[in-house]
Amino acid sequence: KTFVDECHKRGIAVILDMVFNHSTGLNPMNKLYPYGDDLKYNPWFNVTAPHPDNVYEDWNHDFAPAKKMMIRALNYWLTEYKVDGFRMDLSHGLCGTTYDAMDHITDYYEKGVKAVAEDAYFILEHWGPQMSSERPKLINQGMLCWDNTTNAYYQTAMGWLKDGDSFTNANRDGYVTYCESHDEERAFFKAKQYGNGDLKTDDEERIARVPLNMAFLTLLNGPQMFYHFAEFGFDYSKYQNQYGQWGPNPYSIKD
């Protein structure tokens, strides 16, 4: 609470990353029932996720107690901690036993967010085959949707003109765009591996060019996301060890 209050004193909004799509076997709702092959006896989770890109165990949002728990969690963070909104991980997975997430997403926004905080942010990481038709509808209801423009930023970072201007939704209201995230490689790494001419071999050339991406990003309409440690010019792959982006850094920040 102190953290949120101090951020607000400085004009900084606090947005929580909420993972309502999936959970692991450590979750209490998983421990209430047999696990593994007997997951079918657990009403809180789907045996097989009805949507693409799933990880771990998939929450069954058709199960009324599960949905009630999610709504209460959103209410609680907004009223008790006064956070400014949420980024919903893998939002196209907020579905029940069939691949239809729209009604559940709308309920979470209306009952979980707007019912207690009219102006709170509700940002959806909305991928999947239905995103092209669903995202405009969600935006029209007041929500925001992720828009992945990393390839265009990669091209500019690497010094290639092809697709470097592909920012289809990047400057439109309702979309949250970004240069990098934990799901993609860092732009510095791409420039070091595949850069045009001296960009591939010359550190100074990369340092002079790649940070320009952030200038492009901040000039666009709406909110933008800055991926941690980009400010230090980290240029190693997120797969540089067995732990991926959660592994130890190959060199310390002070270096």
List PLM regions with ranges.
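Short, solvent-exposed loop/turn and secondary-structure capping segments
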Residues: G25-L32, E134-R135, F188-K190, F229, ...
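Active-site-proximal helices and loops of the catalytic beta/alpha 8
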Residues: H8-R10, A73, T79, L90-S181, ...
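Extended, charge-rich helix/loop segments that form flexible
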Residues: E184
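Short, basic, glycine/proline-bearing loop/turn elements
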Residues: A187-D203
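Glycine- and acidic
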Residues: W59, D198-L199, Y251-K254
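Substrate-binding/active-site clefts of carbohydrate-active enzymes
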Residues: K1-K82, L90-A101, I105-A117, Y121
